[in-house]
Regions:
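Bacterial Sec-dependent N-terminal signal peptides
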Residues: 1-21
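Non-catalytic accessory segments flanking enzyme active sites
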Residues: 54-152, 163, 251-305, 338, ...
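Hydrophobic beta-strand positions that form the internal "hydrophobic ladder"
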Residues: 105, 157-160, 204-205, 264, ...
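A flexible loop/linker signature enriched in serine peptidases of the S9 family
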Residues: 110-117, 141-145, 164-173, 188-192, ...
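Beta-propeller blade signature
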Residues: 121-124, 175-179, 221-233, 278-282, ...
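A conserved hydrophobic secondary-structure block that centers on an alpha-helix together
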Residues: 129-196
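Cap/lid segment of the alpha/beta-hydrolase catalytic domain
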Residues: 138-151, 163-169, 183, 417-423, ...
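Active-site-proximal cap/loop segments of hydrolase catalytic domains
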Residues: 504-704
Length: 704
């Protein structure tokens, strides 16, 4: 009886907290008005774009205080976080990768709750017990906010260059390890961005920008990317400028050299996902780059080189991709030969292994894989465990094949595949503290507003009743040729085991069905994406999975835009909205860091009157209306996000707090020493997810 009374008292206290109207900090404002094609558009919270100003810093601190006080009073938040930690505390291992130049195997492992995964090295397969730590990113900072972005071994096996990022920023720094001694050398490269390291001799090529002005490191437009060559043992100030193209400042450039160091490739990409490729024969003294392709709207991905042959995955003439081959004597695209033609499914990747090829296709947003001969004939299918996502690993001159497999209820498992017997065996299986067989995952196809069938994955616990009272976490993205496929995340389990439903929609704008599917969700067809997502919510309600009182929508980055647009267009449909690191100001997004790179998907407010009108018509920031009742909203961003600058979320949250006519919380959670999401330490991830799921359940009147 006493326990019941205490529980009732706790619920009454929680209900009282929900009824209290929150008081929000006053955001800095000015009278800024922009004019687009004769149309005046006010931007009163423009001062929040200055993320290094004292006024912005004070507002951020005050907003975080309101948010943290609210979240800390959710009675079950601690219990939820503890369960998330329990579920995340399992050993996670990557597929092993053979490094030919050193004759050893590398793999990543996380013992459970380590903030960053550790890189291990072993002499041979099966020798995992004697594996040695090669690089432990957890030792690079006390709080786990320094992340390893990549490691690159020299072709002579003497050195390894590794890239790190700090606090989630896209800026990279390179350091060098002497492989034989394990000693860290004095070499240090700064202001690299969107860069790997490609070795030639005792040095490597990398891509960087000029050092930004102090105070604008995380907001200034990135232009004129340059390629440098760094010689080991020399200071960065002596690095040789290898390539730049000031005539096209808004392009990315990178160099790659094959492992035999016989070919060099220059990769050029503009705004969007297309690219051009140039090749140079390093065996010929004073040779120059030869242009292979000339269409920045299409993709040409170099997959492998074998002798003088070059293999490319491309959507040129094949919206769902095809595999093509050419050689140094016939580099121009018009002379390329189709090795594997386009099929009805999306070709995602090709792995060369032991005189064979493994082609990984996507069918209805799930992986299907096949073994091919080198002359392009299909030999067999690789049987995968269930609907899910697979990634393949192998080397052209070795027999070993590994693949990772994951689905909504299947934690990432590593398999070793035998090409001779066509059998898979488990190489590394995680042990998560939940019972996989207790859950159901189904895929349905629902009609969008225009009748297009959209794939929707729905995951829930067995025995769930479709009575319209189940909480739903509806997730989407819909853009930039990025597919949403099945994957495991332990933080969802507490929600699902408590009677929740996780729903994931594969919206237009992604690559689930090729380039046509992508284009159907871009520029002046972007509304299709929002219609797809809104229709998913309506379908779930119509089919009694949930109701408006239990429907939450969540999305990050372009998915944050998705949530922002849908909640402004249909505020009546959702109970809770979580726009994460979203693009909220569609009129000014291209004026920050690499926002210009998104123009092929979005268009810009300067393109034309028609494009401005279209963007203005759905831009989340510009479609918040005074007097409208909006759902409970938790906006998330981070102080070091230099991909989608936090000003988007700052201005959106400040405006929503000012106009919302409903007595619903409008909070913004601003993470510190964090960025767009990549490299975020596990401890920060779990804290954030406990806040998000706690906020959702609490504002639905539910508990955990």
């Amino acid at each position: 009886m006493k326990k019941q009374i205490l529980l009732t008292a706790a619920l009454l206290s929680a209900t009282s907290m929900m009824a209290q109207k929150l008081t929000y900090p006053q955001a800095p404002k000015d009278g800024t008005i922009d004019t687009y094609f004769g149309v005046q558009v006010a931007d009163p919270y423009r001062p929040l774009e200055n993320d290094s100003s004292k006024a912005t810093a004070e507002w951020v601190a005050a907003e975080n205080k309101v948010t943290q006080e609210y979240l800390s009073r959710i009675p079950f938040r601690g219990k939820l976080l503890n369960r998330m930690k329990e579920l995340a505390n399992y050993e996670k291992v990557s597929a092993p990768s053979y490094i030919k130049s050193i004759g050893k195997w590398l793999f990543y492992k996380n013992d459970g709750l380590q903030n960053q995964s550790v890189l291990y090295i072993m002499d041979s397969l099966g020798d995992e017990k004697n594996a040695r730590v090669f690089l432990n990113p957890n030792q690079l900072s006390t709080d786990g906010t320094v992340a390893l972005k990549g490691i690159y071994f020299s072709h002579n096996g003497k050195y390894a260059a590794y890239a790190i990022s700090r606090s989630g920023s896209d800026w990279q720094e390179f350091y060098i390890i002497d492989v034989k001694t394990g000693k860290l050398l004095d070499d240090h490269i700064t202001w690299a961005k969107f860069s790997g390291a490609s070795w030639q001799g005792d040095g490597f090529y990398y891509s960087a920008y000029d050092a930004p002005q102090k105070g604008l490191e995380f907001s200034n437009v990135n232009s004129i990317q340059k390629i440098y060559y760094h010689k080991i043992g020399t200071p960065q100030s002596e690095d040789v400028l290898f390539y730049q193209n000031p005539a096209n400042p808004m392009r990315f450039y990178a160099v790659s050299v094959n492992e035999e160091e016989t070919m060099m490739f220059l990769h050029e990409s503009g705004a969007g996902s297309g690219n051009n490729v140039y090749v140079r024969d390093l065996r010929q003294p004073n040779s120059q780059f030869i242009q292979m392709t000339s269409n920045l709207d299409l993709q040409y991905s170099l997959v492998e080189t074998i002798g003088d042959k070059m293999y490319f995955l491309t959507n040129d003439g094949a919206p769902k991709n095809r595999l093509m081959v050419t050689d140094l004597k016939h580099p121009g695209f018009s002379e390329w030969k189709t090795l594997v033609p386009e099929s009805k499914d999306m070709l995602e990747g090709v792995t060369f292994v032991d005189d064979k090829m493994i082609l990984n296709y996507m069918k209805d947003a799930s992986s299907h894989a096949y073994v091919y001969s080198m002359d392009g004939k299909q030999l067999s299918e690789i049987k995968l465990p269930t609907l899910g996502s697979a990634g393949f690993y192998g080397e052209k001159d070795r027999k070993e094949v590994f693949y990772s497999f994951s689905s909504f209820t299947v934690p990432t498992t590593i398999y070793q595949y035998d090409l001779n017997t066509a059998n898979s065996k488990v190489y590394a299986a995680p042990k998560v503290k939940f019972k996989e067989s207790d859950y159901v995952c189904e895929q349905v196809f629902y009609p969008s507003k225009d009748g297009t069938k959209i794939p929707l994955f729905i995951t829930y616990k067995k025995g769930l009743k479709r009575n319209g009272k189940n909480p739903v976490f509806l997730y989407g993205y819909g853009g930039f040729n990025v597919p949403l496929t099945p994957y495991f995340s332990s933080v969802r389990i507490p929600f699902i085991e408590n009677g929740g439903i996780y729903a994931q929609a594969s919206l237009r704008g992604g690559s689930e069905y090729g380039e046509e599917w992508h284009i159907a969700g871009t520029k002046m067809q972007k509304q299709n994406v929002f219609d797809d997502f809104i229709s998913a919510g309506e379908w779930l309600i119509e089919n009694k999975y949930t109701s408006k009182d239990y429907l939450a929508i969540v999305g990050g980055s372009n998915g944050g835009l998705l949530v922002g647009a849908c909640m402004t267009q249909r505020p009546d449909l959702f109970k809770v909205c979580i726009p994460q690191v979203g693009v909220m100001d569609m009129l000014r997004y291209h004026k920050f860091t690499i926002g210009w790179n998104w123009a092929p998907d979005y268009g810009t407010s300067e393109d034309s009157k028609e494009m401005f009108d279209y963007l203005h018509g759905y831009s989340p920031l510009h479609n918040l209306r005074p007097g409208t009742k909006y759902p409970a909203t938790l906006v998330t961003t981070a102080d070091h996000d230099d991909r989608v600058v936090p000003a988007h979320s700052f201005k959106f949250a400040a405006t929503l707090q000012a106009v919302n006519a409903a007595n619903t919380p409008t909070l913004i959670r601003i993470d510190t020493k964090a960025g767009h999401g990549s490299g975020k330490p596990l401890s920060k991830q779990l804290e954030e997810q406990a806040d998000i799921y706690g906020f959702i359940l609490y504002n639905m009147g539910l508990k955990y």
